[in-house]
Amino acid sequence: MLDGRPDSPPITIALAKGALLPEAIQCLQQVGIDFSRFLDPGNRLLRIESPTRLNGQRYEALLVRTHDVPVYVEYGQAQLGIVGYDVLRERYAGTEARVAHLLDLQFGHCRMSVALPQDSPYHSAAQLPAHARVASKFVGCAREYFDRLDLPVELISLYGSVELAPLTGMADAIVDLVATGRTLRENGLIERDCLFESTARLIAHPISYRVNQQPIRELITQIRERWLGSLLVGG
């Protein structure tokens, strides 16, 4: 209870397990919200509340699989989420997004690209023959891209290392996330075309954003000033 008033319920943020988590937690720590317990190797909790508040507002976090972040936000179980733009593009490929995009957080830089074998006779996606086989974990993004090229291809959905598909002859090309390109090179592939750049984004449930507009706007302001401002100074 603050100033004799009952506490408002916490605002829930869905955070993605994996590569984005440390910087997502660091970003929120910069504005006074602490979910660092998720980084404790002994932690088994998937839902925690920050021991600190931002302007009196309580915050809690859900730790979920990367592709589940927009789902939790879309269905209102989390008011906010931090997730890669690539995940949003894949989730809403060919449809209207059902979450609000609030802020580019400027970390988790990578790109969605087409890669071909080094010995391929083709030097771009547009040169691939009709009905070429393309492997990807992001078939929605891949389909949108090849539709724009007006090139019919057979899309193969994979969940593991898509670099294996051309090596085994299963696919002529892949569409995948690329950061440094090292994994591609080590597996005899060359990045040929970039579909789009991706960074971590702050998203919101549209109705929850309107209901919690003041605290969420305060959060956005603090992230801009303390997190994005520090990146500009450091950069």
Swiss-Prot record:
UniProt pathway: Amino-acid biosynthesis; L-histidine biosynthesis; L-histidine from 5-phospho-alpha-D-ribose 1-diphosphate: step 1/9
InterPro entries xrefs: ATP_PRibTrfase_cat (IPR013820), ATP_PRibTrfase_CS (IPR018198), ATP_PRibTrfase_HisG (IPR001348), ATP_PRibTrfase_HisG_short (IPR024893)
- Catalytic activity, as annotated: 1-(5-phospho-beta-D-ribosyl)-ATP + diphosphate = 5-phospho-alpha-D-ribose 1-diphosphate + ATP
Q: Which organism is it from?
A: Synechococcus sp. (strain JA-2-3B'a(2-13))
Report the locations given in the UniProt record.
Answer: Cytoplasm
Family named by the database record: Belongs to the ATP phosphoribosyltransferase family. Short subfamily.
- Read off the Gene3D superfamilies from this record: Periplasmic binding protein-like II
Keywords for this protein: Amino-acid biosynthesis, ATP-binding, Cytoplasm, Glycosyltransferase, Histidine biosynthesis, Nucleotide-binding, Transferase
Q: Indicate yes or no for the key word Cytoplasm.
A: yes
Instruction: List the protein's name.
Output: ATP phosphoribosyltransferase
Q: What does this protein do?
A: Catalyzes the condensation of ATP and 5-phosphoribose 1-diphosphate to form N'-(5'-phosphoribosyl)-ATP (PR-ATP). Has a crucial role in the pathway because the rate of histidine biosynthesis seems to be controlled primarily by regulation of HisG enzymatic activity.
One of its Pfam families is HisG
